[in-house]
Amino acid sequence: AAGDVDGDGKPDLVAGRNWYRGGDWAPRPLRSIADWNGYVESNGDYLLDVNGDGRLDVIAGSFTPTEIHWYENPGEQGLRLGKHWKQHLLVDTKNSRNEGQLLQDIDGDGRPEWIVNSWIKNVPTVIWRLTDKPKSAKPGKKPDTSQAIYEMQPHQLGEKGNGHGLAVGDISGDGLTDVLVGQGWYEQPKENAWGQPWKFHADWDLHASVPMIVTDLDQDGDGDLIFGKGHDYGLLW
């Protein structure tokens, strides 16, 4: 993930165990991560101010652990001293077969949603919405920055239809963002998107990359799909 972690106006990078300051790009510690069968247990790092203190924190998911954690930016002094970022639980999804995640604004309200992809084909696809947590701080009292200002609320797009591969983009041409997975795509309803299942179109059967990309490659006015082969070679559209 890319963003201004240290507040110096330059973009920095976050990747797994380390963050890299824009300019010298030297690795600096962020968190400890276990290995799983040769994989680093991290497959989705994203930057967001989770506690409302004005600094970018990290939200991260993984393969088999079911929890989504956020890691608290330690601020100027903590970053300078190379302190690990404090880990906090954001939500336990109860899902342990996660291929990858995206943090993307799906409904256009300016706040991103958390989308989880599974390598299992016939399991639900779930979007987790970040909603405002009720404020607990009393007037005049300094907010507790160890607490997230968001809660995560699940919305199941469909009971079946997932599989290796994940993207977001407008496939139907209605101006709304749809969700693409390895077995097809979910069409965002024109109204009440979070109050109903989304229509699933089983238009393909891919073992594809995370992410895939939706863009109009041939300039014919509709969204095309660029994808890599998951755990294989090749880039196709």
Where do the PLM segments sit?
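Beta-propeller-forming repeat regions
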Residues: 1-237
